[in-house]
Structures are given as C-alpha cells and as structure tokens.
C-alpha cells in the first residue's frame, strides 16, 4: 500500500490537524499508519529520541498514529532566520542555508532527500498520510515543487483538498485551486473537505454541489469548528490561538504575557501554561501588557540577536529591566534566556559578523558563546526534587560568570529565570509548582487545580476530540480507501 496527500487551499487551512485526525482514525482501524511532510517551513520544532529535529506538527501526528517520531516523517525543515534566508534541517540535522532566490532553483537535492524518505516510510508501513505545504496552486513555485502536487505526481498519490471556511471565500478558494492546476494535477484531486464551519451545513449544500459539478471533485464532508483544540501549530499565524488580545479576562487569573518576537520559535512552550484553569496567557508586542502581567515570558527565537535588537526598539527591553528592579517575575527560554545574559559572543558569525560581541540585557550573570556545532538533545534533570525533562535546539553555549542559583540547566537571580530547555513546562508538577510560586510572588490568589488534566492527557483528549469530529462529519472510510 502507499499513501494520500492532504493539501490545503492556503496556509492555516487545517491540513496539519486533518492529518493528525486521519492518523488517529486509521490507527483506530488497526492500520499501521505514519505521517509525512516533505518540507515544513516552521520555527516550531522538536527533538526526536534519536537526536534528530523535526517539525512539532509532525511529532504530534506521529503521536496520533501511535508510532515513534523520526526524521523521515519531516525530512526537510526550513527555519526562517530572516525574510530572505532559511536554515535547512535535512533529515534532522543542520543542512546549510537556503536563500530566497534559490527557493525555486536550488531544491533538487532537497527533493531527492524528501522522496527517499517517503519511499522509506512506504516500504515499512501500511499507509503514509502526507501533508502538503501552503497551497498547491502557487504556480510560481511549481518548478521544483516536491511537497504538494510534485510529490503527488512522483508517488501517484490521490489528493484531498482542505478549504478553510472560517476566513471566508472557501468556494472560491476550492474552485480557484482547481482552476490554476494543469490537467495532470487535476486528475489527482480525489475530493475536498470544508473545514472550520460554524452553523447549519445545509446552507452550504448548493455551493458544494456547484463545486462538484464544475470540477468533478466530490465533497468528503464539512468539518465543524472544534472548540477547545489548540494543538502544536507550525505557522506563525497559529501562535497564541488560545488567546486573542482584547478578550475579557477574569480578574482573579494569573496573567502571563509572552513576547511575540519577529522570529519567535517553539512558542508551544507556553501551551501547557495556557491549559491551566485560571491562567491567562497572552502573546503580545505591547509593552504595557508586558508590564501589567504577573509573569513575563521571553520565549525562543530563531534569530536571537536581531530579536534582541527588536526588543530594545519596541520598548519591551526597558519593561524587562524595570520588572527586574521591581522584583517581578521574568523567565527566558532558550533564545529568550540568552537575551537576559550579559554578553553574546559570535566568533563564527552564526547570526552576526564573525567575532561580534553583543551586549545582552545583563540581568543574569552568564556569557553566551554561539558555537559552530548545533546542540540537538533530550535533557533530564531535577528542580526542587521534581524530575523534569526537556529538549535543546541551539547554537548558544551558556557559561555562568559568577555563582547563581541553578534553574534546570540555567540560572535564577531574584525574579529573573533562564533555561535553555524547551518543553520543561510541559511537565505537570514542575509547571504547577513554578507557577504557584510565581503567583505567590505576584500577590495573586491563583493556585493550581490538583484534579485537572495534565498536559499530555489534555493533548491526547484533543486528538481524540478531533478524530471523533472527523469520523462524525467526514466520509473517512472513503478517504482511507483511496490508498492503493
């Protein structure tokens, strides 16, 4: 057997979650299924057990499928460092850089690696559910495409098209995608799903019939908006999906502000905080919001130095310094931790000109040295006797310049905390203990609910909810039977 490709009419149409749900439904049916995304462009990544790096979305999909995540499931990961340059992760390891001008011409070696990974999965599993990237109708990118219709043509995959009705114009998006494809690609379109619908889908019926009449594509169903599900996203659009600026906030909530850096990475670190009842997490670029919060988080960054410069221009660096003087909690994770340190050395020019010395915010007695070798590792340790694990994705090597209280692998000075570990806050006891301390420090009455679902249990429940919705509203059997 082989696979199918789930493509979308746009970024954030819902491809990742549809693939997640399909993987879980196939697993329920006893199918040995694996996810695959030839190329992912995302700064939200995860370290596998073998030390390889893949997109968080594919890691989640592997969890839904009940298989061990590997680099074959996301053989090419592009991590944007600037608007014109991406860092390449090839089969889970650093693979150089890709300039914007090379995007359509310099990708043959990436395609070969991606398709070889697909063949590897197809040879060892019953079914491969592939996820496309962006839209398959970007005809300016057709040359060299290996993740959308290029993959479908190469591997003879039927394509399920996902359209997002929540943003409006779904019928035009479905028809427009079909219209822009050539005849060979159209022949691979097996049908479509309308995603994120709110209301009575009977009102859609005439439009769906018209789309089918014009294109020959059948509708596999209308998937409703599923509230309360915010699983690992890959797009910047998805950061903070659980909270929108301006939403009403319970005054008794523990208020957590997360700085939205231009090159924010692994923003999923705060998902677990957002899942706690009574914790209000807001991703923001507003200095006033950062000042008012009980806890301020500086998350990961793919471009630490440029995001540090932005932090200063935005006025948030002044807020961070003021909070430290006032004894108010600030925590930095990976790139955010490095910004809190005294100096950043870049001898090999990882982010700046070789030999540069960049002044940090100076709130932690630590020096950062950007090493040529990238660290990719799963890490384990304790904090106050609590077992904690995390994962590391960084070039920066941190050295303490004087004695400071240890915090996981990092340090803690007064109200300022720093760690290189992503994923630490996914551990329930650690997260709840740390947040409770932060609440007491802020004079907040918030305390964790001991009977509440933990982070991993909550994620599993969300996957099940998605799969249930897919089975209830979409002709899943018809989709799975497309596999030949």
Swiss-Prot record:
Pathway the protein acts in: Cofactor biosynthesis; adenosylcobalamin biosynthesis
Lineage, broadest ranks: Bacteria, Bacillati, Actinomycetota, Actinomycetes, Propionibacteriales
BP terms from Gene Ontology: cobalamin biosynthetic process
Function according to Swiss-Prot or TrEMBL: Catalyzes amidations at positions B, D, E, and G on adenosylcobyrinic A,C-diamide. NH(2) groups are provided by glutamine, and one molecule of ATP is hydrogenolyzed for each amidation.
Pfam families: CbiA, GATase_3
Swiss-Prot/TrEMBL keywords: Cobalamin biosynthesis, Glutamine amidotransferase
Disulfide bonds: none
Residues of the GATase cobBQ-type domain: 253-430
Catalytic residue list: 334 (nucleophile), 422
Domain of life according to the entry: Bacteria
Species name: Cutibacterium acnes (strain DSM 16379 / KPA171202)
Protein name: Cobyric acid synthase
Family: Belongs to the CobB/CobQ family. CobQ subfamily.
Gene Ontology molecular function: any one: ABC-type vitamin B12 transporter activity
């Amino acid at each position: 057997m082989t696979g199918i490709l789930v493509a979308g009419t746009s970024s954030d149409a819902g491809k990742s979650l549809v693939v997640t749900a399909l993987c879980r439904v196939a697993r329920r049916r006893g199918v040995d299924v694996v996810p695959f995304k030839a190329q992912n462009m995302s700064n939200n990544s995860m370290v596998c057990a073998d030390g390889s790096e893949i997109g968080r979305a594919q890691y989640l999909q592997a969890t839904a499928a009940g298989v061990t995540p590997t680099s074959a499931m996301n053989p090419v990961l592009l991590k944007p460092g600037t608007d014109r340059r991406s860092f390449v992760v090839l089969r889970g390891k650093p693979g150089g850089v890709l300039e914007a001008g090379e995007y359509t011409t310099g990708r043959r070696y990436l395609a070969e690696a991606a398709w070889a990974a697909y063949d590897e999965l197809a040879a060892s599993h019953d079914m491969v559910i592939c996820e496309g990237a962006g839209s398959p109708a970007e005809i300016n990118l057709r040359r060299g495409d290996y993740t959308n219709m290029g993959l479908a043509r190469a591997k003879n995959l039927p394509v399920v098209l996902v359209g997002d009705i929540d943003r409006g114009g779904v019928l035009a998006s479905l028809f427009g995608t079909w219209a822009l494809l050539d005849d060979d690609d159209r022949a691979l379109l097996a049908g479509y799903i309308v995603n994120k619908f709110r209301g009575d889908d009977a009102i859609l019926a005439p439009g769906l019939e018209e789309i089918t009449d014009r294109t020959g594509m059948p509708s596999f169903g209308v998937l409703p908006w599923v509230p309360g599900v915010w699983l690992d996203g890959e797009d910047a659009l998805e950061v903070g999906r659980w909270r929108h600026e301006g939403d009403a906030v319970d005054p008794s909530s523990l208020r957590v502000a997360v700085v939205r850096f231009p090159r924010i990475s692994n923003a999923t670190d705060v998902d677990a905080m957002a899942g706690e009842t009574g914790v209000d997490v807001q991703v923001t670029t507003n200095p006033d919001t950062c000042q008012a919060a009980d806890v301020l988080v500086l998350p990961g960054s793919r471009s630490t130095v440029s995001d540090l410069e932005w932090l200063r221009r935005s006025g948030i660096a002044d807020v961070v310094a003021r909070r430290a003087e006032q004894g108010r909690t600030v925590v930095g994770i990976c790139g955010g931790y490095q910004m809190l340190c005294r100096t950043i050395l870049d001898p090999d020019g990882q982010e700046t000109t070789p030999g540069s010395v960049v002044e940090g915010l100076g709130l932690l007695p630590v020096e950062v040295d950007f090493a040529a070798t990238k660290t990719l590792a799963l890490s384990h340790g304790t904090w106050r006797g609590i077992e904690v694990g995390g994962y590391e994705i960084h070039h920066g090597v941190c050295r303490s310049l004087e004695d400071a209280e240890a915090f996981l692998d990092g340090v803690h000075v007064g109200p300022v905390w720093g760690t290189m570990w992503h994923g630490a806050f996914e551990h329930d006891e650690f997260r709840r203990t740390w947040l409770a301390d932060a609440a007491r420090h802020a004079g907040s009455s918030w305390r964790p609910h001991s009977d509440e679902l933990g982070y991993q249990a909550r994620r599993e429940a969300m996957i099940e909810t998605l799969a249930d919705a897919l089975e209830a509203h979409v002709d899943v059997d018809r989709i799975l039977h497309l596999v030949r």
